[in-house]
Amino acid sequence: MIQKYPSRLLEKAIDQFATLPGVGRKTALRLALYLLRQPVENTRQFAAALVDLREHISYCRRCHNISDSGVCTICADPTRDQSTLCVVENIRDVMAIENTSQYRGLYHVLGGVISPMDGIGPGDLQIDSLVHRVASEQIHEVILALSTTMEGDTTNFFLFRKLESTGVRVSVIARGIAIGDEIEYADEITLGRSILNRTDFSDSVKF
């Protein structure tokens, strides 16, 4: 049954809200009606924040985290451990690890994991830039903190092989996170312990 709306403008707003992940048309209707009940200035500020988000946020040229300028706040922080690099899939993983307060090093965001079924190969990820960072910066340890999935494990092994000849220590977070889980959904205590209890990657696999 096709839903009819009393206003073309309302329907237009619903159409836009419904494009968001996890938002159906009923939820989109509730959101649109909620905004209608707000003061006009509040709605303007909401809309302006979304436009600013899209137009002005960029990606850190060093680690590929989100940034308001060329370099993100983490990379620009002189108090961070510049010798340790934590490799993650996406920006949400950076936020999850930061919330544990158990890690004070730098990050490198791959932008995903190797997944042939999805057409994602090594060349589609920020792997070359990772190798370049390890070669050009004073990195002593690379921590692999990817999802405990088949794709995550495949990517871990690929990265280990790429970095093996550099002499840098390559470690992997402990298996406190259930197999098949993604980093961002792990609770802070479990994730924090997984980082603290990390082990050398070479000890975690059989060649």
Swiss-Prot record:
Pfam families: RecR_C, RecR_HhH, RecR_ZnF, Toprim_4. PANTHER family: RECOMBINATION PROTEIN RECR. May play a role in DNA repair. It seems to be involved in an RecBC-independent recombinational process of DNA repair. It may act with RecF and RecO. It comes from Porphyromonas gingivalis (strain ATCC 33277 / DSM 20709 / CIP 103683 / JCM 12257 / NCTC 11834 / 2561). GO terms for molecular function: DNA binding; zinc ion binding. Residues 83-178 form the Toprim domain. Keywords: DNA damage, DNA recombination, DNA repair, Metal-binding, Zinc, Zinc-finger. NCBIfam families: recR. Belongs to the RecR family. GO terms for biological process: DNA recombination; DNA repair. This is Recombination protein RecR. SMART domains: TOPRIM. InterPro entries: DNA_Rcmb_RecR, Rcmb_RecR, Rcmb_RecR_Znf, TOPRIM_dom, TOPRIM_RecR. The keyword DNA damage applies. Gene3D superfamilies: 3.30.60.80, 3.40.1360.10, 6.10.250.240, RecR Domain 1. It comes from the Bacteria. A zinc finger (C4-type) spans 60-75.
